[in-house]
A protein has these predicted regions:
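Long, charge-rich low-complexity segments
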Residues: 204-239
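Residue-level detector of family-conserved "landmark" positions at structurally sensitive sites
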Residues: 30, 63, 179, 199-200
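Short, structured secondary-structure boundary patches
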Residues: 27, 47-53, 198-202, 218-221
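GST-like domain detector, emphasizing the conserved glutathione-binding G-site
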Residues: 1-128, 228-264
Length: 264
């Protein structure tokens, strides 16, 4: 049995879960970002990041690597297109989702997401910079969608990587209305059985987690990593980030453990 160390609110684990469900692969799920599961997570990934997939003696800790492994291990139904050109396109959009989209949405959502509970105000210009960059990516996606309404000829890892990020834009005040092809893509994605079931699962998880008297997650500190820090610094918010570090509200993983995609 495959074990997935995940979290219902992580876009990376949401992508992996949808790929597993797309391929009808049974798996055990562990909400590894819950404080109670922290030691179990560190045991398989010293950086304490999700997702982590364990299949027998094999441990894989990067979502793109997990997807690639699942495509090789369970080739049908495929989640990558058939032609080299479309495969490259799908991987390119997955990379945009995993790096740039994640960084922007993470950095401007700290004052929106209930998991963070920030009571201060964002630094001036941060949210506006995020909205501008998000709208630029949406314009690129609008131009990239094919005649079938997906990134490639049919639903692929590109769509499953983009959807968890783009489905959160409404909460951030970013509308898809100026992008009719993206709007139609969003409708088509929500009509897919795998995505429909996934959204119901996320909704149930949210109700369970936030209806509890005490959150199972660490709410006072935020984990930052390369892409998220890079986007922030590129837009001139070095002083704000340094203040977060000084106040102990930011966690930067420093482990350089070789326990990564470990094959005995």
């Amino acid at each position: 049995m495959i074990t997935l160390y995940d979290n219902p609110f992580s876009p990376f684990t949401r992508k992996v879960r949808m790929v597993l469900q797309w391929k009808a692969v049974a798996f055990e799920s562990i909400d590894a970002l819950a404080v109670a599961e922290h030691e179990r997570l560190v045991a398989v990934n010293p950086r304490a990041e999700v997702p982590v997939l364990v299949d027998g003696d094999l441990t894989i800790v990067d979502s793109a690597d997990i997807v690639a492994y699942l495509e090789d291990r369970f080739p049908s139904p495929a989640i990558l297109p058939a032609t080299p050109a479309l495969r490259a396109k799908a991987r390119s959009w997955q990379r945009i989702a995993d790096t740039l989209l994640d960084a922007i949405i993470h950095d401007i959502s700290l004052w929106t997401w209930p998991t963070h509970r920030r009571t201060d105000q964002p630094p001036p210009g941060l949210v506006e910079a995020g909205h501008r960059d998000l709208e630029e990516i949406l314009a690129q996606l609008e131009a990239s969608l094919d005649s079938a309404g997906f990134v490639c000829d049919a639903p692929s890892v590109a769509d499953l990587a983009l959807f968890p990020h783009l489905s959160s834009l409404k909460l951030l005040g970013v509308s898809l209305d100026p992008f009719p092809k993206v709007l139609q893509w969003n409708r088509q994605m929500r009509a897919l059985p795998v995505v429909r079931a996934h959204l119901e699962s996320v909704k149930r998880s949210a109700l369970e987690k936030f209806a509890a008297a005490a959150s199972p997650y660490e709410a006072e500190k935020v984990v930052w990593r390369g892409d998220r820090i890079e986007w922030l610094l590129a837009h001139g918010f070095q002083a704000w980030f340094q203040a977060e570090l000084a106040a102990g509200r930011a966690i930067v993983r420093t482990s350089c453990s070789t326990k990564r995609n470990e094959i005995p």
